């Protein structure tokens, strides 16, 4: 890898190519255009149909049923959510009317895990009252819990480089019961990958640092982190400067948001990419090329005196002064060996089948189970990763801001029908292709069995539901969705030593390429990806 030189400024009226049109690409374009409205920016989208947003996709059926085919909420606590919301309001103030939230005390903020000792039993975690606490302690989920806590507090085991989440947790907690029975479920829900195949340095670098500083993750977690609070303030001030809004305004919004577990949009998550895209398409210097598949990228190096910028040629027919890679094709041909090696190390992402379930007039979810949904731990040996109770989330949404729309004000409860069911099931299809899946078999194996077992619906009622013409089941195969952030790739809890930081710096300073998206963000969430886009755009200035 080359030593870095001083970053040369993009020329006035220069050209920038942005690969992809997902949320990362859209926000990168927005942030860069705020700083440099003179630049000609072209987004290159592989798909021929004019839908932007990547994995974010709210589908409306011909019966106007809203189904989320990707993420459906944002975490209020994530500082990137504040950046997203402030940016969208700046683009279009009417977005305020679309913003909704879930309260911390709401049913939709409850979460369950499947008990591996009794797979038909859902156990609330964390338990919210004494009876639920006793239920948790009696379940298989609590096996080894007390021993694990004391082992972490008193163990003097030393951190190792490049540990998997599984190896780290077993070393800290003394055995694998807690990670197999509880922790693995959370990682299945986020990454759709086994904890043995995930890098601890990537997934939980803060816990790695807590162990290094305090010798125990529990002791470290109990310490007040003043550095983190100061970093948050500095980050918010950077956001405010770029968006040209008052520091105190963005700080107040973040303060309000961070106590809210979930943020959503009335018309669905596609509100987010659609708002950004509609704003960008009004700009004469921004263009989108649909049906353009980026397969090859060639960096024409700058002259020996480093006076001129390198130019980048895409597919031998488009040339740009700068290229931003938000979407990086797995088979991208590029004359940069270190990037190629990193992409090969990540390998193919996970394959997940999403099963959307909807019934317009029947509520299958009992009051005792009303929650965000449930996850399935590793010890259950099931391909079912988890189930999201969309109808519970929707019926618990509240407006984030007083509406400026009189029509909306008249209808304060925008989900008035409590007697419907909407759920999304996530099934691991790792190693399978779309053609390998029999939808009827999956309907029997996962849909029917979930209704019978976890939702405890009598078999006669389940058969009636399955044969009901109003019962909608839709399948979406998410191919190569989330990268596998494996150990030994080069992730580090020290950001300056992380392979992503090293590559970012080399690509930008030596080759005039910036990067973003899931393969370079600090985490797999939408706010993480947008913050990465913000940082990438700001580095160019």
Go through each PLM region and give its residues:
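Active-site/ligand-binding neighborhood in enzyme catalytic cores
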Residues: 150-293
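Eukaryotic N-terminal low-complexity, Ser/Thr- and Lys/Arg-rich leader segments
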Residues: 1-14, 221-230, 238-249, 304, ...
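Dinucleotide-binding Rossmann-like beta1-alpha1 core, especially the glycine-rich loop
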Residues: 62-155
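Mid-domain catalytic core of redox enzymes
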Residues: 35, 290-423, 431-432
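Conserved flavin/dinucleotide-binding core of flavoenzymes
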Residues: 6-7, 15, 126-129, 386-541
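Conserved Rossmann-like nucleotide-cofactor binding loop
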Residues: 24, 49, 330
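N-terminal Rossmann-like FAD-binding beta1-loop-alpha1 element of flavoenzymes
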Residues: 8-43
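Glycine-rich FAD pyrophosphate-binding loop
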Residues: 33-60
